[in-house]
Amino acid sequence: MNIYIDENIPYARDFFTGHGNLHFFSGRNASAEQLIDADVLLVRSITEVNEKLLSLNKKLKFVGTATIGTDHIDQTYLKNRGIVFSSAPGCNKVSVAEYILSSLLVLADQQQFILSDKSIAIVGAGNTGTAVYQRLNALGMNCKLYDPPLLLAGDKRQFCTFEEVLEADIISLHVPKVVQGPFPTVHMFDSKVLSQLTNGQILLNAARGDLIDNQALLELAEQGLTPTLVLDVWENEPHINQQLLPYVAIATPHIAGYSLDGRVRGTEMLYQALCDFLQLKGKYTTADFVHRAAINSVSISKKIDQPLIKSLMHLIFDVRRDDALFREMIEDVDGFDTMRKTYQERRELSTLTVESSVEQNTLLQLLGFSTNVQNEIKETHEI
């Protein structure tokens, strides 16, 4: 059995060795000729899996994507050919939520505001949007959810209108790319919508680049008419409009979901799905391969406030590191993909155990940290 695997799916060799002949390929440059003898195809979001890519292959049985999003997969075509498909829903929701949290803590420090004084509209209330909501709600923010498809499907949570989205202090996008249907998301934020936003607002996009009309955004930015921008995703990746970069407060190359834990979680989900398809019992889990974080415990004696949360957060992940590196690497023609391919290891907050009082542990847990009651950890860093 020939298993073709995107070369940037982490720990794939460890998980899949023994299940067939492993062939690793560049996901950005996959071709029909290259995949002609694949029985299993494992990809990421950069590979469009459709009739064109699979036109020469007559034996493919299983396609998997190590991502939450599936808009790069022609599922109708796969179904018509009898090819089993699997994705990794929720695999990197924590990673994206922590990217948003780090970004907002940085901006709050720079602009001198308290997050609990702000309202945030979370556009998209699926796995990732919900993870963002849980963390920011724990910080006391006025969180609003906008998701018409979920509302129509009977979701019992309270949802806001799009008008209310545009009135929020902060807007964070977490919807898939939808081209057609009653609720398309491509250019959801077009020139008309963007022109309704103000300099006092913050707009974050860690979902899909096509949600925002980047050219319209640039034209407004050149006039000084945009909110503070945090962009992890861009139109026309990897060949983004670099003229937009100077106007973006925090800019990164589609790495919000790139924590080691989240990426390996996606690999494990594909591994388990393939084992189920082959009617085999899986032997491995993420814990078999991922080591402890370099900084894995800390003790705090002070009362938790926003600066302390920022300090704890940035022991694990500080988005400013990625922003600075991206602005440097994007000067190279292949810089966007190079940074993603060589992305420095980043862990999730759960890998850090915070020793604190019982009273403070609930908030820490809601933010994603592991916790222990004071004095239960012997070897810790102290803040």
From Swiss-Prot:
It is found in: Cytoplasm. The keyword Oxidoreductase applies. It holds the Pfam family DUF3410. The active site is at residues 208, 237, 254. GO terms for cellular component: cytosol. It comes from the Bacteria. The keyword Oxidoreductase applies. Its EC number is 1.1.1.290. InterPro entries: D-isomer_2_OHA_DH_cat_dom, D-isomer_DH_NAD-bd, Erythronate-4-P_DHase, Erythronate-4-P_DHase_dimer, NAD(P)-bd_dom_sf, PdxB_dimer_sf. Pathway: Cofactor biosynthesis; pyridoxine 5'-phosphate biosynthesis; pyridoxine 5'-phosphate from D-erythrose 4-phosphate: step 2/5. One of its GO terms (biological process) is pyridoxine biosynthetic process. Belongs to the D-isomer specific 2-hydroxyacid dehydrogenase family. PdxB subfamily. Homodimer. This is Erythronate-4-phosphate dehydrogenase. It comes from Psychromonas ingrahamii (strain DSM 17664 / CCUG 51855 / 37).
